[in-house]
Amino acid sequence: PPGSWDLPELPEIGGPLEGEGAVADAQARLASLLGVDGCWFGVNGATGLLQAALSALAGPGQAVLLPRNAHRSLIAACVLGGIRPVFLPVPFLSDRGHPGAMSAQCLERALTALPSIPEVIVGAVLVHPTYHGYGSDPTPLIAALHRRGLPVLVDEAHGTHFAFAAGEALPTSSLHAGADLVVHSLHKSAPGLGQTAVLWLQGMRVSAEAVKASLLRFQTSSPSALLLASCEATLNWMLSPAWERLLQRRLKEAHQLADRLRAAGLPLSRSDDPLRLILVTAERGISGLDADAWFMQRGLIAELPEPFCLTFCLGLASQRGLAARMQRLWRRLQMSQPSSGPLEPLLLPPLETSSTPELLPALAVRAPACELSLQDSGGRIAAEMICPYPPGIPLLIPGERIGLDRLEWLLDQHRRWPELVPGKVKVLAEGPQVQLG
């Protein structure tokens, strides 16, 4: 039976928050090997560790800087902890229809636009890399936030392999760039079992005791020994010469694959992570959602379908034969579609400046609410998230007012992917309305 695969939380095994046992020994050893001050395994994915880490940074009534492409788990942490998010704009790649990576220049502009760093803002979050593999050097971003006295949490769920790569084959990991807290998924961008993740702590800006107290609130009291063993085994392997040899081989193959596909005319966009392939289907008049459904029926599985793109995650398995298969299926897909030009451009998100919800998200989700059609929601305050998943980046946050420009943009998003961006939204029960012109 499945129970035979697992073990109870025996003293000899312990758990992520125990002072003794095999898990505590493994965490201490790995922290030492990576030169950091703390290591905690997680069995509720990067989601649970991000929420615990954010809760260690900020408490009720305090605020944190969040990039607009923050994962929905961080918004949920704000709701659970009574934290106010202060959103920083990120570049929008209009030809691909999704956010890019925040650059040092973009961050400096956003920070300069804030009148000052109020005392209520007690920390900052960065995303490195994005789901699509975009990731500029995080060192100057982290340094800019540290200069303003802010500890930095980095969501590096999609860049775990960055921290375990030699040389300059991949972007710099935020763990090596001085971030105070870093969350790595061990199944998204590493070969661990689903739900496994790890949280790293370094420096003196965040206390280990605050992290432990937060983990105690957010993590299960009965962690699976199977998943904990996967955390240790995955990290052990990623510190071995065998991992480095495999990673370098797969990176070389990924570069060759991308070059071959581009030479064959496939509209591939550039990513900072060679293990991500971004097929810009919109250039040929095809929605990424339609392309994904068509490919899936023929056994070609992508990672992330969007209105303008289809992103593939190459992973660590051999991709022998993939280039020829993708070329063949791409030709067949184009032949199956009526000839047309590029898709109509997306409306740009009206999120170019720093902002904070008018109402604390924790209050907005608990306030009396009613459901309206999206068309009729102008001027109202949102009582829920609108968040297509994947990628899990909210388009609307509880507590934000739905102004005219935001409403027009949300309606455009609904038209582009109606199954993931609903045509209805919960709003606070009373409030002024704005009519579309």
Predicted regions located by residue number:
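Conserved beta-loop-alpha segment that forms the PLP phosphate-binding cup at the N-terminus of a helix
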Residues: 38-64, 76-77
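Active-site phosphate-binding strand-loop segment of PLP-dependent enzymes
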Residues: 96-161
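Substrate-binding/gating loop at the entrance of the active-site cleft, primarily
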Residues: 66-85
